[in-house]
C-alpha cells in the first residue's frame, strides 16, 4: 500500500529524557501552494528541537509535511502551523522551525518560529578552542 499524505503526527518515547540533546531534521522537499496565485512554493524546512518525553517519528513527519503540497498557505502561516502542530504532539523543551523558501519574484523568504517550555533553561554551550 503506497504512503499517503496525513495530518497525523506520531511520537515515540525519548530514549534519554534525563539528557538535554538537540535533534536536527532537514526536510528539503516541502511544497505548498501560493494562496494568491495557486503556484507551487518550495522550501527546505529545518526542524531543531530538544525533546522532553517524546520524540517525533520520522515517517509520520514525512507524511505530515507532504500533506501541505496541495494547500494554499502564506509562508509565515504555514511555518507557524507546522511548529504549533509539532509542539502540540511532542511537548519539547525547545523547538525551532526554520522554513527557507525558494526564490519567488526575485525574493527569498526565510521564516523562523520557535517555542520554549516555560520551565526549561538551556545549558551553556561549551566553547571549544
Curated annotation (Swiss-Prot):
Residues the record lists as binding substrate: 56-58, 75-76
UniProt keyword annotations, A-Z: Cytoplasm, NADP, Oxidoreductase, Queuosine biosynthesis
Gene Ontology molecular function terms on file: preQ1 synthase activity
Active site: 34, 41
Function field: Catalyzes the NADPH-dependent reduction of 7-cyano-7-deazaguanine (preQ0) to 7-aminomethyl-7-deazaguanine (preQ1).
Family classification: Belongs to the GTP cyclohydrolase I family. QueF type 1 subfamily.
NCBIfam families registered for this protein in UniProt: QueF-II (TIGR03139)
The protein's name: NADPH-dependent 7-cyano-7-deazaguanine reductase
Organism this protein belongs to: Methylococcus capsulatus (strain ATCC 33009 / NCIMB 11132 / Bath)
Taxonomic classification: Bacteria, Pseudomonadati, Pseudomonadota, Gammaproteobacteria, Methylococcales
